């Protein structure tokens, strides 16, 4: 499989503020942005695995995948890597925090679907196991990573995060969205509908479309049904958050890049 891609990184450091004479300088907030774009064959999957931060998927204007990952925090951005793994089933993207246990190193392992087998966090560590066996034990810091993914309609999408929201805006393909502590939001039209299965273990499910709703013993909610006639599947799941399905109008967000054509595998760093 041929992959044409670019990975560019830019860092912005906020100016430290002067507070008082006894504590003259507060820590500087650091923001670093990583961009990637490339092409994979039709019918494959684009999946994003995050730990601390949001994942938002949008329909791409063109035929390439576009990825924007923004790190924010006071720690060194190099402590969290953005891994892009090309494989025969598609593309897997992970926010990779430092390993906490050499016996369980983090594995950005590709999958074909599914959520979390295990996801637990403390103040300093997280234990993550996906259904496919990937994940690991990692050290947490104050860095969060927010992803925006633009996906061509010919590709499937899977988004996962622990502490953050997962949202899909007017995607026209199969979608899986999994969060542990955050919400799941999906905007779609009747024409872009499909078979919906939404489950919140401790929260609620709200829908602007007619779906069958079932309470899970007063501690969660399940919603299922079909929207329109599209032959696609939307699997939405959260543990502690809510799920929202809303009617959306076709619109594209303004491109965040300068629109210049880019080809080849390379790193561009601007600090």
Which stretches of residues belong to each language-model region?
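Gly/Pro-rich, low-complexity intrinsically disordered segments
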Residues: 2-8, 13-34, 106-140, 248-271
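N-terminal segments that cap or nucleate solenoid repeat domains
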Residues: 24-56, 60, 162
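Short, surface-exposed interaction patches in beta-rich subdomains
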Residues: 26-41, 68-70, 77, 96, ...
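Right-handed parallel beta-helix
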Residues: 35-41, 45, 83-174, 222-237, ...
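Short beta-strand/loop motifs in extracellular/secreted proteins, especially
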Residues: 44, 53, 65, 155, ...
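N-terminal, post-signal-peptide region of Sec/Tat-exported proteins
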Residues: 49-83
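Short beta-turn/strand-loop junction motif enriched in small, turn-promoting residues
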Residues: 53-54, 164-165, 182-184
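Short strand-connecting beta-turns/loops that link adjacent beta-strands
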Residues: 60-62, 87, 191-192
